[in-house]
């Protein structure tokens, strides 16, 4: 073999193959392997499962075809039959610690069931609160623990203690448990639950207070917004009222100015006939006081009026014509009627003779004034 290695080393990049290396080593003694397997299976057949090589025949060195061809002795069938290989492969072994755990569970359940059976058989016995709770805890079977039922006195004392101390030290907890006939664990659990309840209550109160504050803030904001809207509305109303007042005032001023404009024209027209009216009144008064001279004045007036109506003389232009009387207003008509009416009966009663032309002139003027007043 060494000669073969030396011969191959002479070539470049020549290395021995894996098959040559495996075949070059001497085979391991099959007797040692078989004896060790037999002793192990016989001594630890109950505790240790069979080796992995025996369960899978392809991994067994004796089943390899090359080794079988090499003249290795096969394991005896008697030894393979004597070993409990199929039992270990089908069923997992049971170890001592597993047996102890199951036995402990069964023994723990038996006394509780026996105690419950004795209590039921003997009738209502006088048991303490702690023993009844222990029986209830044990009879639950470990699946679910029953809820502890506290008496009113126990709850009162626990609430009193919680009011002063939210957390209990161990000596105080032991003392309370001894006084109230409870276990230390029950007192501890009660205080834990009570602290959680207190926390929930405080959180709910804080949330309610915060919500109340938020609501109050929202309400105040809404009230402020409403007040602002009201003030804006009132301001708008006041502004609109002021505008309406101004518009009404301007409208009234315009109406007054429009009314004053024709009145002004009437006033201008009234100013023209005022002098003849006043002169007529004076003349009428003068007629009453000076009766002898009246026929001369009236005759001259009648002649002048007739001349003004018939001829285009310059004297006729001074006398108001019929067109000038068309501008008279109602006040001027009333004044004229008041001025003329008292003079007529006086003139009729007086012995003075009035000509027909002057009477015709007065009647014509009055009829024209009345017609114009009706048309207006």
UniProtKB/Swiss-Prot annotation:
Main subcellular location? nucleus
Which stretches hold the DNA-binding feature? Answer: 143-202
Q: Which Pfam families match?
A: Homeodomain
Where would you find this protein in the cell?
Answer: Nucleus
Biological process (GO) annotations held by this record are:
anterior/posterior pattern specification; brain segmentation; cell fate determination; cellular response to retinoic acid; dorsal/ventral pattern formation; embryonic viscerocranium morphogenesis; middle ear morphogenesis; motor neuron axon guidance
Domain of life assignment: Eukaryota
Under the cellular component aspect of Gene Ontology, which terms does the record hold?
chromatin; intracellular membrane-bounded organelle; nucleoplasm; nucleus
Q: Which UniProt keywords apply?
A: Developmental protein, Disease variant, DNA-binding, Homeobox, Nucleus, Transcription, Transcription regulation
Q: What does this protein do?
A: Sequence-specific transcription factor which is part of a developmental regulatory system that provides cells with specific positional identities on the anterior-posterior axis.
Q: Which family does it belong to?
A: Belongs to the Antp homeobox family. Proboscipedia subfamily.
Please report the name of this protein according to its UniProt entry. Homeobox protein Hox-A2
Organism, as annotated = Homo sapiens (Human)
């Amino acid at each position: 073999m060494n000669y073969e290695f030396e011969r191959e080393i002479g070539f470049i990049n020549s290395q021995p193959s894996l098959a040559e290396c495996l075949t070059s080593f001497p085979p391991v003694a099959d007797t040692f392997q078989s004896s060790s397997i037999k002793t192990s299976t016989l001594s630890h057949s109950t505790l240790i499962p069979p080796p992995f090589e025996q369960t899978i025949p392809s991994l067994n060195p004796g089943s390899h075809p090359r080794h079988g061809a090499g003249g290795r002795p096969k394991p005896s069938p008697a030894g393979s039959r004597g070993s409990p290989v199929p039992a270990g492969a089908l069923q997992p072994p049971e170890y001592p610690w597993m047996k102890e755990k199951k036995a402990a569970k069964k023994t723990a359940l038996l006394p509780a069931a026996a105690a419950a059976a004795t209590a039921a058989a003997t009738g209502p016995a006088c048991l303490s609160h702690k023993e009844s709770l222990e029986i209830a805890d044990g009879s639950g079977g470990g699946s679910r623990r029953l809820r502890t039922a506290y008496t009113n006195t126990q709850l009162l004392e626990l609430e009193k203690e919680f009011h002063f101390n939210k957390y209990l030290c161990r000596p105080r907890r032991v003392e309370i448990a001894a006084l109230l006939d409870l276990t230390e664990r029950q007192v501890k659990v009660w205080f834990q639950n009570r602290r959680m309840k207190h926390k929930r209550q405080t959180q709910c109160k804080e949330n309610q207070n915060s919500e109340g504050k938020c609501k109050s803030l929202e309400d105040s904001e809404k009230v402020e917004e409403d007040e602002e809207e009201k003030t804006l509305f009132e301001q708008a109303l006041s502004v609109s009222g002021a505008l309406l007042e101004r518009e009404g005032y301007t409208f009234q001023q315009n109406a007054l100015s429009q009314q004053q404009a024709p009145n002004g024209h009437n006033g201008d027209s009234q100013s023209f006939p005022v002098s003849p009216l006043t002169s007529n009144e004076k003349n009428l008064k003068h007629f009453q006081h000076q009766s002898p001279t009246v026929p001369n004045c009236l005759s001259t007036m009648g002649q002048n009026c007739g001349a003004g109506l018939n001829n285009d003389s310059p004297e006729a232009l001074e006398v108001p014509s019929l067109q000038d009387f068309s501008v008279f207003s109602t006040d001027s008509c009333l004044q004229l009627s008041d001025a003329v009416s008292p003079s007529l009966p006086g003139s009729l009663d007086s012995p003075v003779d009035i000509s027909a032309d002057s009477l015709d002139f007065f009647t014509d003027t009055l009829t024209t004034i009345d017609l114009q007043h009706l048309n207006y």
